[in-house]
Amino acid sequence: MQYQVDLNSDIGESYGAYTIGQDDEVMEFITSANIACGYHAGDHNIIHRTIDLAIKNNVAIGAHPGLQDLIGFGRRPMQISPEEVYQLTVYQIGAVQAFAQVKGHNLYHVKPHGALYNMAAKDTAIAKAIAQAVYDYNPNLILFGLANSELIRMGKEVGLNVANEVFADRTYQPDGSLTPRTSPNAMIHDTDEAVERVIRMVKENKIEAVDGTDISIIADTICIHGDGPKSLEFSRRLSHELKNQGISIQKREMHHG
């Protein structure tokens, strides 16, 4: 059987004089880039530079819309209506698409960020608002969401091509949700363990939850983080091991309606 998977990373998350992540290096190992749109991180200069970097590395350009919370890096939940979620999603997609367009390139995908991503995984109304915003903007865009989540379900319902996302360095709850970052066991720090878990997700569609039970999971795209101290070493290792296992790394294909 031929296995293939997309590798994505949240990048362009610097702001002004503050540099976050190792975008230049991580870009060499990924196939899809989720580019911050200015609300939780990123600004006009950084979006411009990050898209140039994606083009240079033949990486799919994606928008990474978040809640309007620079200080909290978009990781704090907010009381926000589905209508406002729709508006902020359209607004942020437009920012990244505009920069891609003036450079003669297209947007491939959209992946919500942080608290917005987590809210959309469980809240049907929020998920529907994001999916509808993406579809109304361009029905050919791919919607990235947590595997088996409400966002994936609503994306399919409105008619979008979706990508079930899994995380290389996060642990999972028995219900398939990510362990909150506030928990001590939220992250996987051992590279070998993280790589083994990813390969199992791609080949067997299974992952061991924190309580030791196996849960079913679909891995269309794997998120690797570019802002950790070992992120480069991990990206290199994961890329190498996936290829060793006969898993090809390639971006998702857009379906044109």
From Swiss-Prot:
Catalyzes the cleavage of 5-oxoproline to form L-glutamate coupled to the hydrolysis of ATP to ADP and inorganic phosphate. Forms a complex composed of PxpA, PxpB and PxpC. CDD domains: LamB_YcsF_like (cd10787). Its EC number is 3.5.2.9. This is 5-oxoprolinase subunit A. GO terms for molecular function: 5-oxoprolinase (ATP-hydrolyzing) activity; ATP binding. Keywords: ATP-binding, Hydrolase, Nucleotide-binding. InterPro entries: Glyco_hydro/deAcase_b/a-brl, LamB/YcsF/PxpA-like. Belongs to the LamB/PxpA family. It comes from the Bacteria. It holds the Pfam family LamB_YcsF. GO terms for biological process: carbohydrate metabolic process. It catalyses: 5-oxo-L-proline + ATP + 2 H2O = L-glutamate + ADP + phosphate + H(+).
